[in-house]
Amino acid sequence: MHILEKKVRDAVAAGRYALIPFLTAGYPDEDAFWEDMGDLDKNGADVIEIGVPFSDPVADGPVVENASRQVLADGMSLARIMQGLRDHQGFFNAGLVLMGYMNPFLQYGFEKLAKECEEVGVSGMIIPDLPYEEAAPYRETLKKHGVALIALVGPNTSEERMKLYADVSEGYIYVVSVMGVTGERSSVAPAVVSTMERARRCFRQPLALGFGLCHP
């Protein structure tokens, strides 16, 4: 069992939902970010998703977009994130996931990134702009280093496509609650129920619901 799947299943076995918070790397500043990471880890986060800032975050709403813009202006980069993880190696009990877009990952060097993820304790990656049809070589590169490529499915994902993801996915499945971008909504969309029902029929992997959540 992949370590991320175990983190989520251990939470469920303890009678609770897994807590998987997201932080934009370097926000509001680098020191505060690592302090926030530690606070989340100490206070029960099962997995922490680290947002890699990018200048054109097409899946993100204004909150994440503005945070990314600020930290990029302050000099945050994937190289600095990896160095920070190296400096904090062994510090976190929570599973660690990088969430970001292909452009900075390719610029960094995907094979190099996968190897360094293994070295610093990153167990998964979420790449919203990497479609299933193009993902196989990147998934295999990550798998060699014990890093899961987390699949994203949503209201418009057919059961047939979900089953394709089910055959190759590790860790957990990221279920997008709404069409559109990240950010708080006043309520959860009614379509979430049917999306989760379809996902439960297709996946043996645990499901994590994200996008548009305003409370646990």
Regions found by a protein language model. Name each.
Residues 1-20, 85-89:
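N-terminal amphipathic alpha-helix/helix-capping segment at the start of soluble metabolic enzymes
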Residues 10, 61-97, 140-154, 190-207:
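Alpha-helix-loop-beta-strand connector modules within alpha/beta enzyme cores
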Residues 19-23, 48-50, 96-100, 125-127, ...:
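Hydrophobic faces of well-ordered beta-strands that scaffold small-molecule active sites
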Residues 27-29, 43-77, 132, 176-185:
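Glycine-rich, proline-tolerant flexible connector loops at the mouths of alpha/beta enzymes
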Residues 30-40, 157-168, 203, 209, ...:
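Catalytic cores of alpha/beta
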Residues 47, 52-54, 63-128:
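Active-site beta->alpha loop and helix N-cap motifs at the rims of alpha/beta catalytic domains
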Residues 64, 74, 162-201:
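Glycine/Thr-rich beta-alpha phosphate-binding loop at enzyme active sites
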Residues 73-76, 121-134, 148-157, 163, ...:
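Catalytic beta/alpha-barrel core
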